[in-house]
Regions:
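Class I S-adenosyl-L-methionine
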Residues: 1-106
Length: 106
């Protein structure tokens, strides 16, 4: 079977790139959804802009580590990943509210 994944380069340009060979996070989300399972450890030995690590963070349930030799990209990737971690997801927020409501019932 053939699988075709269409990438929107305009979306990547809109997000802004920090690395010359930066891949879209959606590409990594797609690959990881096919091959990674909850609890797996993901290693990116050439993290670059940290797109793979951002995808792991968004998917959740994956341990991940990345290496980057270039200090400029390392710093930018760290900043990008920290910004991603700081984002509250709607479903996470709803889950937290649900848990809070359940604990106040008893």
């Amino acid at each position: 079977p053939t699988r075709i994944f269409t990438l929107n380069r305009v979306e990547l340009q809109r997000e802004g790139t920090i690395h010359p060979t930066q891949k879209p996070v959606k590409l990594y989300e797609w690959v990881l959804s096919l091959f990674a399972r909850k609890g797996m450890k993901i290693l990116d030995t050439h993290a670059g802009s940290a797109s793979s690590l951002v995808a792991c963070q968004r998917i959740g349930g994956l341990d991940y580590v990345g290496f980057e030799i270039n200090e400029k990209y390392y710093t930018a990737a760290n900043r990008r990943l920290e910004e991603e971690k700081a984002q509250m997801r709607l479903f996470d927020l709803l889950e937290e509210q649900e848990k809070a409501a359940q604990t106040t019932l008893f």
